[in-house]
Amino acid sequence: MDCNRMVIMNSVNEETYYFGQRKLAWFAGSMKKDYIEAGSWDDKAKAVPYSVYREFALNPAPIGKTLGISEKGDPIWVDIPPKTKHQLITEAEDKKSGLMQGAREVISPLQDAIDLEMATQEETQKLTAWKRYRVLLNRLDTSNAPDIDWPKKPE
């Protein structure tokens, strides 16, 4: 659909919507002056029919898709690009950090019980299992993401 010639008002609120081609963003026409003053207006923004705004701005993207732009400058759904190696490594580092924090939270009171000579046999065994898990986590090389063999969390 070519949106260049179509400006349709929303019959409910009479608003004109714009699709920002450079920023892949949506703008309410009633706030155009504010966007310009704030320096956030997309100079390639174009008015779109409300049906286009509704489809692309008010509904979630289909699974595996993200907002993109057609050759004519209209919004379209495009395939989500595969994650970069850097993104995969960052995700693995974040996961590792979260798992390490979780292990610390479990280990701390168990270690307190040992230190105060109050630990049960079960607590001693749990502490050993959780410390082993934490060591294995710490040894993980996140640069191998996404091919990481994550250790199994103790029960």
From Swiss-Prot:
Coiled-coil zones: none
Secretion signal span: none
GO biological process: virus tail fiber assembly
Family matches, as Pfam families: Caudo_TAP
Keywords: Chaperone, Viral release from host cell, Viral tail assembly, Viral tail fiber assembly
Domain of life according to the entry: Viruses
Function: Chaperone involved in tail fiber assembly.
Family: Belongs to the tfa family.
Protein name, per record: Probable tail fiber assembly protein
Protein's organism: Acyrthosiphon pisum secondary endosymbiont phage 1
Lineage, uppermost ranks: Viruses, Duplodnaviria, Heunggongvirae, Uroviricota, Caudoviricetes
Gene of this entry: 37
